[in-house]
Amino acid sequence: MSSLPNASQLDKSGRRIVVDPVTRIEGHMRCEVNVDASNVITNAVSTGTMWRGLEVILKGRDPRDAWAFVERICGVCTGTHALTSVRAVEDALDIRIPYNAHLIRNLMDKTLQVHDHIVHFYHLHALDWVNPVNALKADPKATSALQQAVSPAHAKSSPGYFRDVQTRLKKFVESGQLGLFSNGYWDNPAYKLPPEADLMAVAHYLEALDLQKDIVKIHTIFGGKNPHPNYMVGGVACAINLDDVGAAGAPVNMTSLNFVLERIHEAREFTRNVYLPDVLAVAGIYKDWLYGGGLAAHNLLSYGTFTKVPYDKSSDLLPAGAIVGGNWDEVLPVDVRDPEEIQEFVSHSWYSYADETKGLHPWDGVTEPKFELGPNTKGSRTHIQEIDEAHKYSWIKAPRWRGHAMEVGPLARYIIAYASGREYVKEQVDRSLAAFNQSTGLNLGLKQFLPSTLGRTLARALECELAVDSMLDDWQALVGNIKAGDRATANVEKWDPSTWPKEAKGVGINEAPRGALGHWIRIKDGKIENYQAIVPTTWNGTPRDHLGNIGAYEAALLNTRMERPDEPVEILRTLHSFDPCLACSTHVMSPDGQELTRVKVR
């Protein structure tokens, strides 16, 4: 395992490439890299270019309303901020939710996880590997044979089915309006799939569109709508009535519960017979594409998720923990309350602290904007052509765990769960690695394969399988508990602020689709005194700190060779593997800031 470079060791010579803007769930991102004469990335700079500011907006508001504000941080991972927020308030006020509410929250959270991962792979990430135009050259009969070889259990596998998909795609291309497929790099040699694999992937792209719109209906049953389903401090905002179908004010009945079960089975079939086989098929063809490990080979963090027994974190299906220095033999405990463990630094962020060599725990966090550019910045304040990363260069703060920059997300969760001995995860990972090695003729070990762009993408698919499988357990437990006579969905004993202490503080944690998510709150006189959120993109998109430690995005891009630097497919592959939501124009710049080309990131 190579050592993790410090910012002071990075080679900042060579050609500078700028990708801007890169739109993500927390705002807009910018990425700059230096490439050497061999087109290998030697320096990477990740910049957050929009200030969220919700922490400031929340001050002085009713903590029972915080979830509705913070939920708007993101419209893709909808609901996860609301869930984390109500957990923070409940922690501060010592509120325990009913068992039904725990199960319903689990179902809503896992629905999000499944939906988000499927949408990510097929509609955000797949086009970094799949060439839809090349699918026009495919033989539908050969595509059918490939589908049956890759996943014989999938029903949609006939030559006629793939011929119909190809015909639809051909009409689309011949219209001259490629839409979401326009501005791609379809002649770039970085694309290696045969036409039949491309056609199969395009068919699954369309199937995933149908699936994603159906599974989120679970949110409308339990949360009233999607996106941004309703939550509440003390439980969930939905009543239960199994006696009268469609009873007013009681959306949870056996008809709606059976509808939920049908959606779970559909997602389970798709994950097992389409999503996972597709990821392994892509990995098998791109078997040498093991770039993008970065921090994953060194430092990983998870708060734990999918708690089976309420308020018992030891029952998390994916456990909490931290790995430092690539030591998988030791998973360290994580305490989000400890001011020595989690701190945010701002020496390279557009914020101001009294002492910028020291970090602040979120309970004591300060959000004071200070936008200033370093002296070597090229361009102007409103049109930056090249950032000066030696100074402040991002609206994202720099969170650290015991001083270390950490990678968070599905890959972190899976490596930590594997190292912690979770049998379900070990079986999944071992099975997948064996399939990869068998299909490629390689003999890679876990540490060679998992800490990579491909490994990060596989971990997300495996987590989708775990989530949808465990949804069946939650559904059965919920129905069983209701039939046993328990109809409670909320604990309102402390709803009235007159029952609250004069001052209180709490923390809510969750594992959002993209990684570790924490909300820290201080309440005084019934109002929010301070609120801080550290989101997954803050961890992964962190700028450097005062000691030169680089973040997950920056580290993952290093040492990647690009086929054509003016068509940065490789940059997008690795950035997308962290599950950013990208649909914006990007620009590739020469060292003097002149635009070379304009592309669309899909």
Swiss-Prot record:
GO terms for cellular component: plasma membrane. Ni(2+) binds at C74, C77, C581, C584. One of its GO terms (molecular function) is hydrogenase (acceptor) activity. This is Uptake hydrogenase large subunit. Keywords: Cell membrane, Membrane, Metal-binding, Nickel, Oxidoreductase. It is an enzyme of class 1 (oxidoreductase). It is a peripheral membrane protein. Belongs to the [NiFe]/[NiFeSe] hydrogenase large subunit family. The lineage of its organism: Bacteria, Pseudomonadati, Pseudomonadota, Gammaproteobacteria, Pseudomonadales. InterPro entries: Ni-dep_hyd_lsu (IPR001501), Ni-dep_hyd_lsu_Ni_BS (IPR018194), NiFe-Hase_large (IPR029014), NiFe/NiFeSe_hydrgnase_LSU (IPR050867). It comes from the Bacteria. Binds 1 nickel ion per subunit. Its cofactor is Ni(2+). Its EC number is 1.12.99.6. It catalyses: H2 + A = AH2. Its main location: membrane. It comes from Azotobacter vinelandii. Heterodimer of a large and a small subunit. It is found in: Cell membrane. 15 or 16 residues are removed from the C-terminus during maturation of the protein. This enzyme recycles the H(2) produced by nitrogenase to increase the production of ATP and to protect nitrogenase against inhibition or damage by O(2) under carbon- or phosphate-limited conditions.
